[in-house]
């Protein structure tokens, strides 16, 4: 059997919007930065990042511009895959701005809908945006699709949250990596 489509789509968000999200991450004093978690909790062997969970109701203009851009991309995805919107979709949980130091990544193959967390069980689609360019490594590998994304500032990808899209990070040996991960869930 041959796979017909990957259901992975993408586009580019303006560099100024990425700079705004990165500035928010670096200057926000009311949201905490914590060790990145997996579905099993904090495990620095699997995921080495410093994450900031950002509620979607935050009205900071830097975040609003980013979420508006992401929602515009969702509309294009739905045009391409109309059955992806069989039910209402919404960003129900805080999204993550993540910082990986050189050599760090989320190395374990994983999906975005896993574990016993009831919130994650409603996830339908995943967004990921690279906030900075990386010269070497730092991409994302999709196991079943044999696809490796190169990290370019503003590159924003969307894909289904389930087992069909197992993926993992690739370390950037010399540079910091910043990404945003957003989950569209059944509302």
PLM-predicted stretches and their roles:
Residues 1-156, 164-187:
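Fe(II)/2-oxoglutarate oxygenase catalytic core
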């Amino acid at each position: 059997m041959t796979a017909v489509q990957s259901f992975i789509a993408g586009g580019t968000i303006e560099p100024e919007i990425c700079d705004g999200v990165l500035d928010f991450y670096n200057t926000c004093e009311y949201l905490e930065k914590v060790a990145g978690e997996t579905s099993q909790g904090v495990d620095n062997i699997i995921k080495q990042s410093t994450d900031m969970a950002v509620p979607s109701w935050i009205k900071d203009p830097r975040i609003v511009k980013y979420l508006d851009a992401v929602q515009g991309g969702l509309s294009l995805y739905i045009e391409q895959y109309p059955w992806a919107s069989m039910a209402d979709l919404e960003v129900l949980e805080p999204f993550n701005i993540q910082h990986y130091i050189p050599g760090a990544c989320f190395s374990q193959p994983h999906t975005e809908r896993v574990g016993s967390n009831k919130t994650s069980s409603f996830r339908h689609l995943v967004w990921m945006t690279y906030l900075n360019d990386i010269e070497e490594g730092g991409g994302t590998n999709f196991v079943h699709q044999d696809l490796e994304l190169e990290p370019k500032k503003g590159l924003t990808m969307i894909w289904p949250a389930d087992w069909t899209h197992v993926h993992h990070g690739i370390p950037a040996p010399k540079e910091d990596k910043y990404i945003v991960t957003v989950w569209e869930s059944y509302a």
